[in-house]
């Protein structure tokens, strides 16, 4: 994929602009590393089927080695794999098209949240031409309200949430509408309390799995009377 976002496109995707004083290093496996003095601040990964742009904050020394975050760590040679293993921060953008999946997504590595994904709207962008058309429309229709919401999302901090069964939650289904759901089971708690008698595949789930239900309700505001969902 012979394509790199420009700064005007980055603005409507929440990404940091590339500055004129930054230097670039091209690594194997189609990766571009951007340096602000001695700090890696941005990375672009690209291939025939994928484009990803994300932020880092990693310092390199005079020999071009990535310095460790702690005294126990060791400097790492600047390479495709070492950059990929670095702790990603802030906003990222990803476009991927393969035989079984195609999507564009704006997310936040710091908060582990998604601002927008074409998957929610089932938009087909399985070719670069369709992706370019989608990006053009996204940029053309990007409003001041969208910019404010994206900046708010960009500056959010991560919160630990004590999830309880019966909790309601809200999620974006597109740029202007929200969907709603409810937590039915906290599977992690069931495993911890040893309340799962059979296996049923639940013991193999990774992360913090939840059983949820999604309501057939879309609303332009995340604020909704819960009685409407319970009907």
Language-model-derived ranges and their functions:
Residues 87-89, 93-95, 101, 188, ...:
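A short beta-strand signature
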Residues 126-207:
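Short N-terminal edge-element motif at the start of the domain
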Residues 213-231:
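Intrinsically disordered, low-complexity, charged/polar segments
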Residues 1-25, 176-195, 200, 204-206, ...:
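Extended hydrophobic/aromatic-rich secondary-structure runs
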Residues 1-122:
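N-terminal intrinsically disordered, low-complexity, charge/repeat-rich segments that act as generic
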């Amino acid at each position: 994929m012979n394509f790199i976002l420009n700064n005007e496109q980055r603005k409507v995707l929440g990404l940091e602009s590339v500055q004129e004083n930054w230097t670039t290093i091209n690594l194997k496996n189609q990766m571009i590393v951007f340096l602000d003095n001695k700090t890696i601040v941005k990375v672009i990964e690209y291939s025939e089927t994928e484009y990803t742009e994300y932020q880092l904050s990693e310092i390199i020394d005079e020999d071009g080695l990535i310095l460790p975050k702690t005294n126990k760590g060791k400097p790492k040679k600047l390479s495709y794999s070492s950059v990929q293993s670095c702790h990603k921060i802030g906003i990222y953008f990803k476009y991927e098209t393969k035989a079984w999946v195609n999507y564009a997504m704006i997310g936040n590595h710091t908060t582990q949240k998604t601002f927008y994904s074409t998957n929610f709207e089932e938009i087909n962008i399985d070719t670069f031409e369709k992706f370019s058309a989608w990006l053009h429309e996204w940029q053309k229709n990007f409003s001041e309200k969208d910019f404010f919401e994206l900046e708010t999302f960009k500056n959010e901090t991560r919160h630990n949430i004590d999830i309880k069964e019966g909790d309601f939650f809200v999620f974006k289904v597109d740029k202007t509408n929200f969907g709603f759901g409810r937590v039915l089971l906290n599977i992690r708690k069931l495993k911890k309390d040893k309340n799962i008698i059979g296996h049923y595949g639940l013991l193999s789930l990774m992360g913090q799995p939840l059983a949820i239900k999604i309501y057939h309700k879309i609303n332009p505001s995340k604020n909704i009377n819960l009685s409407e969902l319970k009907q």
